[in-house]
């Protein structure tokens, strides 16, 4: 019950999240550490574990929470949890997604950002960058891409059905790892190398590229269906049209955020010649094109920069998205 109450309080109150000290993060990670070599025995223990994970995620939406997460070696614990091809691997991915997502500008009292949302300026919050580097340095990419590719047999496939958001979280984490590491640096290249052929591995990059394009096309189709449905409703005389905001929310519900994260990964990978050729081929097979990816990313950047429809402060967004804008220009 204590785990459930803690989770409810942290989710319900931004003030509670801001006031929680590093001691709470440490206690939660200690509870989580038990599952490095243990799988929940029943649904009650599973619910307990999910509450612990949710609490860590909520704390990780604040700068202080991210700092405590790094200091308490939370990144290293995540990698250990992801070594287990069971439920802990997928639940720990949720924590990684929240931990990598940079926090919003210092709020009055506002809800936590959606993972992958607005980025705080690098000079005011460096924890997401540190988390990205630590995760890569601790060999976390191996397990992240195993999750992306649904490796692990029938038991893992069953878990993916229980946690259908896993694909979105995996792509979001890859997108943030690419954005939070300096282009051309060893950590950045280690992420990119998963999509690029090398002398040591000339095969595995193709399935990774194909998987990203597959998810990109699937989410694009869902968003397109939402657009079509909204257009039909907007043409109905009895429909109360609330304009662009309602359309935006409908598109988000259908998978716009996931599509944008996949677009970001595609944009980074397409900077390399061989992957770019394969991306173009796979996109065409799915009825997509790089022009569509460019258009969606342009909309993503401009919407956030406008400071509307859920974007953070204009200055923070401009600083954070400058690198992405440069990538977009080179497509």
Residue ranges and their predicted role:
Residues 106-124, 232-238:
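Intrinsically disordered, low-complexity domain-flanking/linker segments in eukaryotic proteins
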Residues 24-38, 76-85, 137-155, 195-234, ...:
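Amphipathic alpha-helical segments within extended alpha-helical solenoids and repeat-rich scaffolds
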Residues 148, 153-171, 175-193:
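Long, charge-rich C-terminal accessory regions
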Residues 228-331:
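Long C-terminal extensions of eukaryotic subunits of large macromolecular complexes
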Residues 1-2, 21, 40-52, 84-92, ...:
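Helix-start/N-cap signature of alpha-helical segments
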Residues 1-14, 30, 47-64, 80, ...:
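Alpha-helical solenoid repeat architecture
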Residues 82, 105-106, 126-131, 149-166, ...:
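Acidic, serine/threonine- and proline-rich low-complexity regulatory regions
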Residues 9-26, 42, 62-72, 105-107, ...:
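Elongated alpha-helical scaffolds that mediate protein-protein interactions in large eukaryotic proteins
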């Amino acid at each position: 019950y204590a785990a459930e109450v803690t989770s409810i309080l942290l989710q319900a109150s931004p003030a509670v999240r801001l006031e929680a000290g590093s001691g709470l993060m440490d206690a939660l990670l200690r509870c989580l550490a038990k599952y490095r070599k243990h799988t929940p025995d029943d649904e009650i223990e599973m619910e307990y574990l999910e509450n612990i994970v949710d609490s860590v995620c909520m704390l990780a939406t604040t700068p202080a929470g991210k700092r405590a997460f790094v200091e308490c070696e939370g990144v290293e614990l995540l990698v250990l949890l992801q070594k287990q091809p069971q439920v802990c691997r997928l639940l720990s991915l949720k924590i990684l997604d929240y931990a990598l997502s940079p926090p919003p500008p210092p709020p009055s009292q506002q809800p936590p950002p959606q993972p992958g949302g607005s980025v705080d300026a690098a000079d005011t919050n460096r924890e997401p960058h540190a988390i990205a580097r630590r995760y890569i340095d601790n060999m976390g990419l191996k397990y992240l891409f195993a999750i992306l590719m649904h490796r692990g047999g029938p038991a893992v496939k069953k878990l993916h059905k229980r946690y259908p958001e896993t694909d979105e979280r995996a792509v979001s984490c890859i997108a943030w790892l690419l954005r939070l590491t300096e282009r051309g640096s060893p950590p950045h290249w280690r992420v990119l190398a998963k999509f690029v052929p090398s002398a040591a591995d000339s095969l595995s990059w193709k399935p990774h590229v194909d998987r990203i394009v597959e998810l990109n096309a699937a989410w694009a189709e869902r968003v397109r269906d939402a657009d079509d449905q909204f257009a039909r409703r907007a043409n109905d005389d009895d429909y109360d049209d609330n304009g662009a905001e309602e359309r935006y929310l409908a598109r988000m519900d259908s998978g716009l955020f996931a599509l944008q994260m996949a677009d970001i990964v595609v944009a980074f990978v397409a900077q390399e010649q061989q992957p770019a050729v394969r991306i173009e081929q796979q996109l065409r097979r799915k009825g997509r094109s790089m022009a569509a990816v460019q258009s969606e990313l342009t909309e993503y950047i401009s919407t956030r920069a406008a400071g509307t429809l859920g974007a953070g402060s204009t200055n923070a967004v401009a600083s954070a998205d400058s690198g992405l804008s440069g990538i977009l220009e080179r497509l």
